[in-house]
Amino acid sequence: MAAQRHIDINSTQVWAKLHQHQRATRHMHMRELFELDPQRFQRFSLELDGLLLDYSKNRVTERTLELLFDLARKADLRGWMDRMRSGERINVSENRSVLHTALRLPAGARLDLEGHNVAADVHQVLARLKDFSEQVREGRWLGFAGQPIRDVVNLGIGGSDLGPLVAADALAAYAHPDLKVHFVSNVDGQHLARTLERLNPATTLFIVASKSFTTPETLLNAQAARAWFLQAAGEAQIAKHFVAVSTNEPAVRAFGIDPQHMFGFWDWVGGRYSVWSAIGLPVMLSIGYDNFRAFLDGGHAMDRHFFESPFDANMPVLLALIGIWYNTFYRAHTHAIMPYDHGLRRLPAHIQQLDMESNGKRVGRLGEALDFDTGPVIWGEEGANSQHAFFQLLHQGTRLVPCDFILPLNSHYPLGNQHDVLVANCLAQTEALMRGKNEAEVMRELSHLSGEQLDMLLPQKLFPGNQPSNTLALDRVTPYSMGMLMALYEHKVFVQGVIWGINSFDQWGVEYGKQLARRILPELSGDTGALGHDSSTNGLIRHYRERHGK
């Protein structure tokens, strides 16, 4: 287990200095910062392999960043980065290494974990995935009727669903033209039923993605999919239409899946970081092995940038520290993600899971209570639509909401000047949120009004501005740039967890509700005695029974 390196970060001198700095600068307006420094964009932006980070539209000065870098050093961020990279067991509550970065290593790389080269294991699994995916994509993998596969249904939940779904959606321009990939996660039966009603059992392949092969939601969907399939074929045909991403060979075999078609991964890969592993099989089936390798290469490029760059030229570190500035010192509490790309519309949900499951913690690594704000609420929506939904609150509401704008500069689907319109809207929003509109500017607009009408309308049209944002501009959404983008947010979340003193790699909060659900399930059918819950839960159980005649 990793040595316990404990620092009461909120008792440090730099923590106090950051609070003092926030109080001294909280009324500073970004409009003034830009007016005083015409080179602000050049000084507060950086680029890596076609990915530009503009963090100039933030309530930060060079002094702010100096203090935040001091905070990172005080938290021993570089040490924690090195410990993660080398395979030390930094997931202390589960006594595990955290090595999703190893999944992105190039061929021939070496990473020894307790005397064993895990990079070689990774590439052995990749080779098997490559062989299988090429059989399916080239029409050589045939179903029970001798036809090639036309639809792939991924059955998973959490990290076994959302990461692959986001990557496959974003990279639809690279998808096989005759192979559709579907994702089913919800235990609500309509999710699976509405997917299957459009499919042909003879040309459908199911991926059951569950490391333990015991995840209740996934197994319920897998059993339902199996029953649907058996209406058209015999049990002997299951092996042609079901594969598993799992490490539980006996359970996989009992289901009817050939263990030769079981693809494993390791306990040092957390679910929300697993798209880079065999969990990414649906992505590989969609875009092909070479493109999937480019996706891994993009992630690896961000890894190298993260581990090797100084803090002041390090995208994940900068995003993380600026996020801490708002969340912990401004107590902003939320952070919005707006991708201006339809293919990235589910990216906010992925980042939401990644961030909130990792850093939604009230205790530190040693179990000590934390008396400062940690993980923010992450939310968002694709950009153009969100402008007509919640941007009103961003512009004229009472809350500070830091935002990330994600903008591909080129589209795979150019229609007239529509992409120019999209880009113009994105850039306009970042400027409007920063600048606002002051009284003099509104008065010029309303120069034709006077008296009560002017007095009434003037305050309605004021925009305070000073709402912070980062802009991440990609040349184009490609497998490589998507890999960089997803790895960027992984590392950002890790940095924030280190500074807050959190173990970002467990998720005990997910378990309690599952325990209670197992208790409540038999009570819904009336097969138990007295209910032992609070009056609300007991009342809801009885209400359900009444509606179902139980």
From Swiss-Prot:
Disulfide bonding pattern of the chain: none
GO cellular component, one term: cytosol
Active site: 357, 388, 514
Keywords: Cytoplasm, Gluconeogenesis, Glycolysis, Isomerase
Location within or outside the cell: Cytoplasm
The protein's enzyme class: isomerase
UniProt-listed InterPro entries: G6P_Isomerase, G6P_Isomerase_C, Phosphoglucose_isomerase_CS, SIS_dom_sf, SIS_PGI_1, SIS_PGI_2
GO molecular-function term, one example from the UniProt record: glucose-6-phosphate isomerase activity
Pathway as given in its UniProt record: Carbohydrate biosynthesis; gluconeogenesis; Carbohydrate degradation; glycolysis; D-glyceraldehyde 3-phosphate and glycerone phosphate from D-glucose: step 2/4
Region Disordered, annotated ranges: 527-550
GO biological process, any: gluconeogenesis
UniProt KW Repeat keyword: no
EC number: 5.3.1.9
TM segment ranges: none
Catalytic activity field: alpha-D-glucose 6-phosphate = beta-D-fructose 6-phosphate
Principal location listed in the UniProt entry: cytoplasm
Pfam family membership, one: PGI
NCBIfam families in the record: PRK00179.1 (NF001211)
Family: Belongs to the GPI family.
Stated role: Catalyzes the reversible isomerization of glucose-6-phosphate to fructose-6-phosphate.
Protein name, entry field: Glucose-6-phosphate isomerase 2
Species of provenance: Chromobacterium violaceum (strain ATCC 12472 / DSM 30191 / JCM 1249 / CCUG 213 / NBRC 12614 / NCIMB 9131 / NCTC 9757 / MK)
Gene this chain is encoded by: pgi2
